[in-house]
Structures are given as C-alpha cells and as structure tokens.
Amino acid sequence: MAPVIPAASAPHKPRKFYQHLYVQVLAAIAIGILLGHFYPDLGTQMKPLGDAFIKLVKMVIAPVIFLTVVTGIAGMRDLAKVGRVAGKAMIYFLTFSTLALIIGLIIANVVQPGAGMHIAPASLDPKAVASYAAKAHDASIIGFLMNIIPDTPISALGSGDILQVLFFSVLFGIALAGVGDRGEPVMNVLVSASQAMFRLVHILMKAAPIGAFGAMAFTIGRYGIGSVANLAFLILTFYITSFLFVVVVLGLVARYNGFSIFALLRYIKEELLLVLGTSSSEAALPSLIEKMERAGCRKSVVGLVIPTGYSFNLDGTNIYMTLAALFIAQATDIHLSLGDQILLLLVAMLSSKGAAGITGAGFITLAATLSVVPTVPLAGMALILGIDRFMSECRAITNFIGNAVATIVVARWEGELDKDKLAAALSGRISVEDDDLPIEATSPAQ
C-alpha cells in the first residue's frame, strides 16, 4: 500500500479569527480566570468540565500511540533504524534533561529565591505532604523498569500506561514487519484505523475550549490568585528560567538544526494553550503526534520519540526539581555544600525519569528526590504545596516544547525529516485545521 497522496481540492475560505482553535481556547482561559476570581464557589464547580475533557483525550492516547508506532515501524525497510532512533533519542533526552537540572541548580544559587525566610523545619507540618511522600516511597528504579512490561497487551491499552503501550507497540511493529507481504492485510487495517483515530482526535479537540475553561475556573476558584503573593518570587524565578531555557537553549538547538523555535511555537500554539488551560501535557499528546507527522517527521520517529519523551524528556520538571529543592533549603536556613548539591543532582536525574505528563507528577518526583537526600527536609515541601498548581502549567508547557524540539532534531539526525514539509508547516503554508489533509501512511511494501 503506497503512501496517501493529497487529493486536489478547492482552496479553503480564510477562517475568521474567532474560528481558530487557539483563539477559542485563549478566550475560554480568560473567562475561566474571571469566573474563578469573582465567583470562586461557582468556579470550583466547573472542575468536571476540565476532568471530562482530559479523560476524553486520554481515551485515545493509547490507540494513537499503538497505531502510530506499529504502522511506522512496520513500514520501515531497515529495522536497525528502530534501535538507532531509540538510541539517539535517549542520548538527546539524557543530555538536555541533565542540562535542565544543572540550570535549575545554578539559578537557585544565583537568585536565591528562598533566602531570608528563616523558617524553622520543626514548625512545618509533614502531614500536608504525607500522601506525596507515600507515592514517592512506593516508586523505585527496578519497579519502574518492571512496570514497563505489561501483564497483557489488553491491560496496557486498557490502563493507558504510555510506556507499556509503547513497549508492546514496538515489539508488535517489529513482528509485523518480519512477516513481510503476509502482514500487508493487517497493515492496511491498521493504516485505516490510524486515519480514523486522528479524525476522532480532530473531533475531540473541538471541545478543548470547554475543558480549558473548566480547568482554569477550578484552579483560580480553588486556590485563588492571592495565594501566589507570598511566594511570587519563586514562581517568577521559575517562569523566567523556563522561558530562557526554551528561548536560549532550545532556541540554539533549533537554529543549529535548521528551524526557528519561534516558528515552532506558532505552529503548536493551539496545543500550548490547551496545556496551559488544563495543566497537563497529556491533553495535547495526540495532537502533537499528528502535527509532527505533518511537519515532515517520519511516523516511526514520531511514534518512538514523543511517547518516550513524556517520561524521559521533562525539561520543565527538571528545572523545577532542583530549583524547588534549593528554595526549601534556603527557606529553612540549611546550607548545601557542593557535594550535597551534586548528590541532589544525581538523585534527581534518576527520580525524574518516571514522571508522566500528568498534573502533579513533578511534585511527586520532587518528594522522591528529597526522600533520598536527607539534608533537605521533606516536610519543607509544605512551603510550596499551595503554589505548585500554578507552577505545573509552566512545567507542562516546557516539557511539551522540549518534546516537540526533540522529535524534529532526532528525525533530522536519522535523515527522516522532510525539510520542505517542515518549512511549509512552520511558515503556515500547511493548515492542520483543514479536515481534508491526510495522515501519512506507511506499509511494509514501501
């Protein structure tokens, strides 16, 4: 089965500004903020709208990953490329995740957002973070690795565990490619199912403004804008650091690899606003997979890099972990030597690898890190518990951008990037809102 070729069609009528998804999501976020601020009780009641939308998106994440990975791998002529793509992706993830941790450490030492607070560790209530500490205690490297192997393929798809789905999908894709032409009927079915699944993603994205409105109204109504005032300096430091990481570090990576970080941000602006509104990068995962394919990244690369990156390439979470850990130490007047900070960095490198793209995962990984580093009191997390929700948006957005950049970079390294399609997508010549644009299809006979 050959790749799907776009059929000639009449040019689309230009959309009015309010018909664009990013405008609708932005307006929904603004309305949610106003409702949560002026009518907090009513705002908190909007939570089911955000939860329902995230559940709708999570419903399609597992099948989207399965179909993308299987059809991508089975359509490759050289299966050795699968190993090369995975290896290059892990090198990229390890390099930039470590760099993000180091940047968070440096900024915390230079800016010192917790200095002068003089909070006695004995005065902190450990019960406030007990549930997070318990979740962190249950996590271990061996347990994390063993959990990647699903009990059954159905349980992986049913639970929606990204790494379990990815693990089975890679094995099944390799097996399907191994049977050659006999697997083509199965491949044809999967390609058609993939196209139908992405059409479903388009349908679900129409509800994004409702989900963003509900999630933002709840956040402001529940926590209040005023709750950030006392720790505004920490929040500001984290936001500025993440912004500079995206613009400077990822910007240089993008420029070196032949594209503009700002053009990429324009290309994924709808997804970024969705992540901002829902505080979950998972909410935009299916849409990111589709957009990276349309931007010229080969399906097999997209299917491997993005799902893996959601656990191993968390730049925003890594910046947050070292910055927050040093903030707690500074606020409680605990001096961390260079050796203590290096230990903190090494532990954070390991504990951050199991975080999923869900709200609150960064807080749990921070608890896992502090539970291993005895110098910083775990109870100190109570200091940032109230504002963590306001920092999770920035974590999720930075993680999301990092995975978009990683996908393009790894595709280029592997020679699986269509530079003309990338240029067309980033310049706006390809509209991903057009319903008649086909999804790339691959087959064993390609």
From Swiss-Prot:
Claim: Transport is one of the keywords in the record: yes
**Is Membrane among this UniProt entry's keywords?**
yes
Gene Ontology cellular-component annotations: plasma membrane
Task: Give the matching Pfam families.
Answer: SDF
GO molecular function annotation: fumarate transmembrane transporter activity; malate:proton symporter activity; succinate transmembrane transporter activity
Gene Ontology biological-process entries: L-aspartate transmembrane transport
Membrane topology, as annotated = Multi-pass membrane protein
UniProt-annotated location(s): Cell inner membrane
Keywords linked to the UniProt accession = Cell inner membrane, Cell membrane, Membrane, Symport, Transmembrane, Transmembrane helix, Transport
Q: Where are the transmembrane segments?
A: 20-40, 56-76, 91-111, 160-180, 200-220, 233-253, 319-339, 344-364, 367-387
What does the sequence similarity comment in the record state about its family? Belongs to the dicarboxylate/amino acid:cation symporter (DAACS) (TC 2.A.23) family.
Described by its record, this protein's role is as follows:
Responsible for the transport of dicarboxylates such as succinate, fumarate, and malate from the periplasm across the membrane.
Protein's UniProt name: C4-dicarboxylate transport protein
